[in-house]
Amino acid sequence: MPAKLLVGVLTEEKGLVSDVASALVDRFGPVDMVSCWMPFTDTSYYEKEMGGPLFRRIFAFSHLVNQGGLADIKLCTNALEDEFSRDGNRRVNIDPGFLLHSRFVLASAKDFTHRIYIGKGIYADLTLTYSAGAFRVLPWTFPDYTVQAMIGFLTDVRRRYDASFHLPDSFTPVATKD
């Protein structure tokens, strides 16, 4: 099933994001939803390289993507991070992922116990599941993906995604034999 592509952009330089968004549109097509700016305060992991305070904004793309292309999408966004870097430091962290009716998955170049290798040095991170009418946080979900602003945005994106298939909110996928 095709997936809804979402790309998170983390930066200290909010003014840079319009150029990053243009580069993303050149590669992935038009954007149909954009989140509000969300403060990124749960870790200082990126601050030495990127400064602070940091903020995240999520872009949802109009065109659905093949789930099997997530590794290539992550490699593309990694290259964009390099393009926007200065003096060897990233100015943006770009995190692609996809949304389906039942889950939200991010791509990562870092291995961890719950991540599945999908090729080309990239792993799929099941970040949130959707059941009983709401997104469900998992033990490893990044804290910034658990806040109400993020969950609300993802819920709105999910509604739009489901509408493209005319799926009711109560739809539950059923496994089929091939």
Regions found by a protein language model. Give the residues of each.
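Long, contiguous binding/interaction regions
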Residues: 1-46, 52-56, 65-94, 98-177
